[in-house]
């Protein structure tokens, strides 16, 4: 993976995202996760081979490729318009019933019912909490019905209640879908089919949660740090 100036940002890497399964991508800040995501999206050049269903990414129309992706990021991007506009991205051929179904699947129907689909939203998500905005972003991804789901720290900015809603909606939505889940929270990855661990631009570990957690390596170190932080936070809440 290269910068526009040709500088190597990450790699060499070798892995496969299994069709219909979820792969988690973890690693410390600066490990190269963002570079990998941007490369998969077609925003960054690369050397070697990167194929999508056997077709080289360079040969694909990148705009069309991105239209097949349901994306949920760390900071939900909402547009100036109504709740309906934000979920449908302004497409007028989508029935309100479909919008409502997507909102229900994203656990957003509770607060949307209070405001209505025509509730106006500014481009800074005014009037909504971060958790509510993230659930609208999830509803948008569900309605898009992408063949590939890309989840980039989707719960990093959320409180515990909102995180529970979003993770529940995501888990239900990506069943039987091909998904890449970038996260710093390792405990929820016990049911993930494959975990990739990056450090300094390289893939240093790969496997299942149970195996990686028992091996000496970066994943076990990060997991121990995660658990210590959770225990400390629980102590603060109990105090």
What is the meaning of each model-derived region?
Residues 26-28:
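The feature captures the beta-strand-to-loop junction immediately N-terminal to the Walker
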Residues 46, 109-136, 151, 158, ...:
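ABC-fold ATPase nucleotide-binding domain signature/coupling loops
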Residues 76-120, 145, 161, 218-221:
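Conserved "ABC signature" C-loop
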Residues 168, 185, 190-239:
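C-terminal portion of ABC ATPase nucleotide-binding domains
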Residues 163-175, 187:
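Helical segment within the ABC ATPase nucleotide-binding domain
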Residues 40-42:
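Helix-to-loop junction immediately C-terminal to a conserved catalytic motif
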């Amino acid at each position: 993976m290269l910068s526009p100036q040709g500088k190597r940002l990450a790699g060499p890497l070798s892995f496969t995202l299994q069709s219909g399964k979820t792969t988690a991508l973890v690693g410390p800040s600066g490990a190269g996760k963002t570079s990998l995501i941007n490369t998969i999206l077609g925003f960054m050049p690369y050397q070697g081979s990167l194929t999508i269903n056997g077709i080289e990414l360079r040969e694909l129309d990148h705009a069309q490729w991105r239209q097949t992706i349901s994306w949920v990021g760390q900071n939900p991007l909402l547009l100036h318009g109504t709740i309906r506009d934000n979920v449908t991205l302004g497409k007028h051929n989508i029935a309100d019933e479909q919008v409502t179904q997507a909102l229900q699947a994203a656990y957003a129907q509770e607060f949307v019912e209070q405001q209505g689909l025509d509730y106006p939203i500014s481009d800074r998500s005014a009037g909504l909490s971060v958790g509510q905005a993230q659930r609208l972003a999830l509803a948008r991804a569900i309605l898009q019905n992408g063949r590939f789901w890309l989840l980039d720290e989707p719960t990093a900015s959320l409180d515990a209640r909102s995180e529970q809603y979003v993770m529940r909606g995501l888990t239900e939505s990506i069943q039987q879908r091909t998904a890449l889940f970038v996260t710093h929270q390792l405990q929820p990855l016990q049911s993930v089919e494959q975990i990739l661990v990056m450090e300094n631009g390289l893939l240093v570990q790969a496997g299942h949660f149970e195996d990686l957690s028992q091996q000496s390596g970066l994943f076990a170190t990060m997991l121990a740090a995660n658990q210590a932080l959770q225990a400390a936070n629980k102590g603060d809440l109990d105090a």
